[in-house]
Amino acid sequence: MIILHCTQQTTWNKESQNEFFGNTDIEASNSIKCIEPNKINAENFSFPSTIEHTILCINTDLLKKVPSTQEGDFIYFSEPIPLSAIIATIPYAYDSEDKFILTRDIQDIMFINEISPKLDISINEFKYFRDGTDSRIFLLNGKYIVKQNTPALLKSEFEFSKTYSENSKIQRVILAEENYKYIVYEFIPGDVMHVVEHIDDLLFHIKEITNSYKDYTGPEFGYIHEPSNSWIDFLKTKVHEASLTLPDSFDFLPQVYEAISTLEHCDFQKKLIHGDFGTHNFIKKNGDFVGVIDPIPTAGDPLYDFIYACLSNIDIVKHLSVEFLVEKTGESAEKVKAMLIISLFCRMSACLRHHKEDLDNYVDFWYQIMAD
């Protein structure tokens, strides 16, 4: 791969990038300057200021004629650069002193170059995933998901993957940096399950996965990377966080804390559970459930994950009742209703932040549960 500095007609802004990519190949510029990837840094890398600047990352393996390039060379292409050769396009800027600003995107390119030899691959495709996640995520060559987050969280994800390595529905970690600066997952092809078409089939897979959870013998409760003192403390924290985003008219806290008190007297199974087990992390292909991604590994009760999954999508909620969940989980009605009340309160908070259009349905379900 080479990284080129492009000016004039090879530049475009981020908003028009997708539209541009859909229409034509990129015409060659009269001003394309080569930069060696390992020499890009904020201290020694700068260009004379022009109106617009773009970094163009090109996979030289896909070019018919690979130009001989060294740092500082100006390159002239006689033909348009094929889109298949474009790995990434990155606008960059100058500060008030006309000094080049090393953007996070450039750092990402350098980071990916560091990873490629560890995977023993030549990178010919590079894509960002930024769909509502707190992690920094890339897709390489359509096969590898590279994730950056806090080392504590990534370590817990790696351990979760190892624990369930024999479960084909749980995404597999294939590489972890020794200090957990990043981990690399296998990519599960498909689409996020925004719409649930086959509820019975999905519930079968939800039950199959939650029934497969293994005992957790560590001292932690709740999130492994940010543990609580107990399972009940974890639930109280989740409820408190949810209460901060719900309006005062949602005067449901007395019922929620009563439900927490009920759970204190119910059987508790301490298992290693997914922790963010919702349809937003379920992948489907050709209508079929094929896998689950993005765990927040948690030491907790499998019932938490089961109900979390059922509440994560309004298509499922419309079919729920306490009796239905008792039948599906085999847990007592007392425990199911208590966990349902707690989880539903937290789900209404998430709904306000991510999909407000469903809130009325969740509120209606709340009153339905309270009336039972």
Regions found by a protein language model. Name each.
Residues 135-139:
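Conserved ATP phosphate-binding architecture of protein kinases
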Residues 151, 179-198, 236-244, 342-359:
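A glycine-centered beta->alpha junction motif in the catalytic cores
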Residues 1-106:
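Conserved, structured core segments of small domains
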Residues 308-372:
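Helix-rich C-terminal or lid/interface subdomains of diverse kinases
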Residues 111, 215-275, 285, 365-370:
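An alpha-helical support segment within catalytic cores of ATP-dependent transferases
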Residues 272, 284-330:
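Active-site Asp-x-Gly
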Residues 280-282:
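Hydrophobic residue at the +6 position relative to the catalytic HRD Asp in the kinase catalytic loop
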Residues 108-118, 133, 143-184, 193-212:
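A conserved alpha-helical element in kinase catalytic cores
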